[in-house]
């Protein structure tokens, strides 16, 4: 495995581990998700550049568009949760209220 691919896979795994272990605030979960999406975007962009195919060149832009939509929906949920509950703790946002 080349050092470039190792760095992107380790960035994805670090984001996944941050998402798994830092489950206290919604904002930290959103930042970990954004880090994972950024590493996926760069990996897919490099993959499409190595293929030299024009049909695969639109794939990173589609992923970036979905990432922006995910970020805007996540921030809207963060604002709504902060207004209704007063904090962004994930324990307060449990829908089952167990």
UniProtKB/Swiss-Prot annotation:
Substrates-to-products reaction catalysed: a ubiquinone + NADH + 5 H(+)(in) = a ubiquinol + NAD(+) + 4 H(+)(out)
Enzyme superclass (EC): translocase
Name of one Pfam family that matches: Oxidored_q2
Organism: Squalus acanthias
Protein's membrane topology: Multi-pass membrane protein
Gene3D superfamilies reported in the protein's UniProt record: 1.10.287.3510
Keyword list, A-Z: Electron transport, Membrane, Mitochondrion, NAD, Respiratory chain, Translocase, Transmembrane, Transmembrane helix, Transport, Ubiquinone
Alphabetized InterPro entries for the sequence: NADH_UbQ_OxRdtase_chain4L/K, NUOK/Mnh_C1-like
Documented EC number(s): 7.1.1.2
Example of a GO biological process term: ATP synthesis coupled electron transport
This protein's name: NADH-ubiquinone oxidoreductase chain 4L
Subcellular location: Mitochondrion membrane
Main location: mitochondrion
């Amino acid at each position: 495995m080349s050092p470039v691919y190792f760095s992107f896979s380790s960035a994805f795994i670090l984001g996944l581990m941050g998402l798994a272990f830092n489950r206290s605030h919604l904002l930290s979960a959103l930042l970990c998700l954004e880090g994972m999406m950024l590493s996926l975007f760069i990996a897919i962009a490099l993959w499409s550049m190595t293929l030299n195919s024009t049909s695969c060149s639109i794939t990173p832009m589609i992923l970036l568009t979905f990432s922006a939509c995910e970020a805007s929906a996540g921030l809207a949920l963060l604002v709504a949760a902060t207004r209704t509950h007063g904090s962004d703790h994930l324990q307060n946002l449990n829908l089952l209220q167990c």
